Amino acid sequence: MLRSEKTGCYEVPGGGIEAGETPEAAMARETLEEAGLIVIPASVREYGCVHRVQKAPWDETERFIQDNYYYLCEAEAPAAPQTPDGYVAQEGCVLEFVDPSDAIRRNRGAGEGFSEPMVLEREARVLELLIAEGYFD
């Protein structure tokens, strides 16, 4: 997972889908950029999608709607330097192998100090599902 050096919170690599890009290709690109890991294409399996609807941070009268796709995959060991941009660069995110229960505890303990608490809760809930379904056994 990516750990923010500012907050100590955890997120999976992710980001926007570029024009003409599939969600799977976006996942592989973002994983390389943010974590320096090369996704093994034959290993990619769709896990699910979280549909996020909330007040828009830029205007309380508008809604922000986002679909967050999750994939299971294997990746080659860190093969490239991280080249994060935007939010991930600002947070000083670094790749860290972490026990999923520890990541859940840290994210839920972050409180309101984190700019996007719903993101942390989303990641915690996805990790809980993965644990319940035996993916970390």
Q: Which positions does each model-derived feature cover?
A:
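Membrane-topology and secretion signals of cell-surface/extracellular proteins
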Residues: L37, V44-G48, E62-R63, N68, ...
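Generic beta-structure capping elements
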Residues: L2-E5, E74-E76, V98-S101
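N-terminal strand-loop-strand
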Residues: M1-V12, E24
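The catalytic Nudix box helix
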Residues: V12-G48
